[in-house]
Swiss-Prot record:
The lineage of its organism: Bacteria, Pseudomonadati, Pseudomonadota, Gammaproteobacteria, Enterobacterales. The gene is mnmG. Its cofactor is FAD. Belongs to the MnmG family. One of its GO terms (cellular component) is cytosol. NCBIfam families: mnmG_gidA. This is tRNA uridine 5-carboxymethylaminomethyl modification enzyme MnmG. Its main location: cytoplasm. NAD(+) binds at residues 273-287. Homodimer. Heterotetramer of two MnmE and two MnmG subunits.
Length: 629
């Protein structure tokens, strides 16, 4: 039986990728259907109760700049906000927020249910309708068929999902949810390369059984950061601290003594896990020289007693999990309310996708999220938005769009995936972007909102606020450029008080702001340059644009040079362990692949453009640079 109305776009799955995809397609005016096995779990945080972090926060800001949902949702659900790397340069500063799971899910569902052009329907999907290598619809569990011009698959870990706790395992999409077996089998019949990955989650602890009095507190920042360019701190709920404990030798002994009961070490799990979010058993074995690991005790919400112990993801048996938890300070009497587990699932080789996230083999079929081999809510949301907007464009018979590497971390993400693929869960870091000085959190709107408007993703309210901000930035830059202070003027003493050496010649506000140690806030408190902007975002942008102008110009030159090095040959017998500055991951992959050129090296999954830059500098210093004819 066919549903009475056809749709332009169908989204299968209501996680972080699916919800962004559905919102994007609907915002662009296309009739959109979101199919989910359970409406109550739309936007659910399956693992850690947090949004953002290094590289990840950048993606959230970019999703927001394109009119997406995630930043708005976390502003209404975040119970602790921090700026990571606050003491470092603006390129690597990143926002992170602890979330109240219930508030986050509510914010997502409210947005979905109030989005025009979007219908939500609760039914698991078991099949796709494919005609002449083109997807034209989907079939649900009860045999109901929906027709559409484009379909987006955002099924997370549900495809043939298998949950492991110790040596026991069972089918599941995540704890408490069934897997998607029939759809997995159907997709395996299509001309797509499929493999298995694994991820895990820690046990959840009853907060009433933890002695917080002996633990260090970690508070959020003041003033409280805001994620969305449309948000404000007044939207945040009550703010609460996290707590810190540590594993110890007793913890590590428990783990080492029970490795034979670990599904990973017993060879039961075939899928490869995330390198940068390893299980506690992996950490203990890989970093045997460390006698402790830091564990963050993160509240799951304002109305919940559950605590997420960030850092002890595990698939060891439940009795071992209890021993691990109770071996740590403050946790001696702790009770587990949900066991930790590992989950294996199908993912599809993203090299089979176009940069728009459309399949190269099935027209109109788009993939986003963990099905593409990524890990993390933020990576999923970014892909979901891109897949949703391109599914909408496909259904309207328009060309697809994907950002370049120099435009967005989203561009880095999809280029890495579609060009190099991945053999392990892919996570975003600032180090993956060679243009990171230009791809900052603070300028995500300046980079992407205009394009979002052209694509139909950005509404009138956001567009108006964006243009007001642009005008304030430009007006203030011109004011500082044209406001001068003379070394003989009466007001110069006020200026000299903030300088390492007194002014010897006339200087503009821009000249002074470029000086080391001078901030915009200091500058506009001086009589010649007062008053300053009362818009903190615009003020930050003025300072960064002026201070980093020269660095950005130099980075552009470096980019051009790097492109000329495409055919630079690499020594055949080079041991990459000699190259200082490369990560262990990159060293292992270069030594394994032994690429013949820089160009070939740059296409190896996991070898970042930043690593290529390090390698080029090292080769030049060693006098080993050779170019092919």
């Amino acid at each position: 039986m066919f549903y009475q109305d056809p749709f332009d776009v169908i989204i299968i799955g209501g996680g972080h990728a699916g919800t962004e995809a559905a919102m994007a397609a609907a915002r662009m005016g296309q009739q959109t259907l979101l199919l989910t096995h359970n409406i109550d779990t739309l936007g659910q945080m399956s693992c850690n109760p947090a949004i953002g972090g290094i590289g990840k926060g950048h993606l959230v800001k970019e999703v927001d700049a394109l009119g997406g949902l995630m930043a708005k949702a976390i502003d209404h659900a975040g119970i602790q906000f921090r700026i990571l790397n606050a003491s470092k340069g603006p390129a690597v500063r990143a926002t992170r927020a602890q979330a109240d799971r219930v508030l986050y899910r509510q914010a997502v569902r409210t947005a979905l249910e109030n989005q025009p052009n979007l219908m939500i329907f609760q039914q698991a999907v078991e099949d796709l309708i494919v005609e002449n290598d083109r997807v034209v619809g989907a079939v649900t569990q009860m045999g109901l068929k929906f027709r559409a011009k484009a379909v987006v698959l955002t099924v997370g870990t549900f495809l043939d999902g298998k949950i492991h706790i110790g040596l026991d395992n069972y089918s599941g999409g995540r704890a408490g949810d069934p897997p998607s077996i029939s759809l997995s089998r159907r997709l395996r019949e299509l001309p797509l390369r499929v493999n298995r990955l694994k991820t895990g989650t820690p046990p959840r602890i009853d907060a009433r059984t933890i002695d917080f009095s002996v633990l260090a507190q970690q508070h959020g920042d003041t003033p409280i950061p805001v994620f969305s360019f449309m948000g404000n701190a007044a939207q945040h709920p009550q703010q609460v601290p996290c707590y810190i404990t540590h594993t110890n030798e007793k913890t590590h002994d428990v783990i080492r003594n029970n490795l034979d009961r670990s599904p990973m070490y017993a060879g039961v799990i075939e899928g490869i896990g995330p390198r940068y979010c390893p299980s506690i058993e992996d950490k203990v074995m890989r970093f045997a020289d460390r006698n402790q690991h830091q564990i963050f005790l993160e509240p799951e919400g304002l109305t919940s007693n559950e605590i997420y112990p960030n850092g002890i993801s595990t698939s060891l048996p439940f009795d071992v999990q209890i021993q691990i938890v109770r071996s740590m300070q403050g946790m001696e009497n702790a009770k587990i309310v949900r066991p930790g587990y590992a989950i294996e699932y199908d993912f599809f080789d993203p090299r089979d996708l176009k940069p728009t996230l459309e399949s190269k083999f099935i027209q109109g079929l788009f993939f986003a999220g963990q099905i593409n081999g990524t890990t993390g809510y933020e990576e999923a949301a970014a892909q979901g938005l891109l897949a949703g907007l391109n599914a909408a464009r496909f259904s309207a018979e328009k060309e697809g769009w994907a950002p370049r590497r120099d435009q967005a971390y989203l561009g880095v993400l999809v280029d890495d995936l579609s060009t190099m693929g991945t053999k392990e869960p892919y996570r975003m870091f600032t180090s993956r972007a060679e243009y990171r000085l230009m791809l900052r959190e603070d300028n995500a709107d300046l980079r992407l909102t205009e394009m979002g408007r052209e694509l139909g993703l950005v509404d009138d309210e956001r567009w108006a606020r964006f243009n007001e901000k642009l005008e304030r930035i430009e007006t203030e830059r011109q004011r500082l450029k044209s406001t001068w202070v003379n070394p003989l003027a009466d007001s110069v003493a006020e200026v000299n008080a903030h300088l390492a050496a007194p002014l010897s010649r006339e200087a503009s506000g821009e000249d002074l702001l470029r000086r080391p140690g001078m901030t915009y806030e200091q500058l506009v408190q001086m009589t010649p340059f007062a008053p300053g902007l009362d818009d903190a975002e615009a003020a930050e942008q003025v300072e960064i644009q002026i201070k980093y102008e020269g660095y950005i110009a130099r980075q552009q030159d470096e980019i051009e040079k790097q492109q000329r090095n495409e055919n630079t040959l690499l020594p055949e017998m080079l041991d990459y362990r000699q190259v200082t500055g490369l990560s262990n991951e990159v060293i292992a992959k270069l030594n394994d692949h032994k690429p013949v050129s820089i160009g070939q090296a740059s296409r190896i999954s996991g070898v970042t453009p930043a690593a290529i830059s390090i390698l080029l500098v090292w080769l030049k210093k060693q006098g080993m640079l050779r170019r092919s004819a």
